[in-house]
């Protein structure tokens, strides 16, 4: 299991962007699941698109996200939302998505928590 320490264990590049935008994948770029992508511009503004975990036994977690103020959640599959509770708890990130995505995500997080208890594996956002 990966235990994150907000701002301490991220592999996100520290160098500034001179121009254009940076796309940085925290997971999911070369695999199914474990999704997370940060888009950052040259002003340092960052936007995270999805932040999930692979639904394996035990789960596979993406790289730690750096601090982001906003995240877009595209849909409620666990490989796109599984790490969002950690993100919101660690950074107070504002989540953006449809009202249906919000409702289904809450159900999915409760189910993920229940399954983790039954199968005896901790979640990185489990406190």
Question: Model regions: which residues?
Answer:
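Pre-active-site segment of Zn-dependent metallo-hydrolases
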Residues: 29-34, 38-73, 77-78, 82-93, ...
């Amino acid at each position: 299991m990966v235990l994150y320490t907000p701002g301490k264990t991220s592999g996100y590049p520290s160098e500034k962007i001179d121009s254009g935008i940076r796309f940085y994948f925290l997971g999911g770029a070369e695999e199914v699941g474990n999704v997370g992508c940060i888009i950052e511009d040259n002003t340092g503004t960052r936007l995270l698109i999805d932040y999930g975990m692979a639904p394996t036994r035990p789960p596979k977690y993406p790289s730690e996200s750096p601090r982001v103020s906003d995240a877009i959640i595209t849909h409620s599959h666990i490989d796109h939302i599984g790490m969002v509770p950690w993100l919101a708890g660690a950074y107070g990130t504002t989540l953006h998505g449809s009202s249906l995505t919000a409702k289904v995500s809450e159900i999915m997080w409760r189910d993920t928590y229940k399954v983790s208890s039954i199968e005896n594996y901790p979640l990185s956002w489990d406190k």
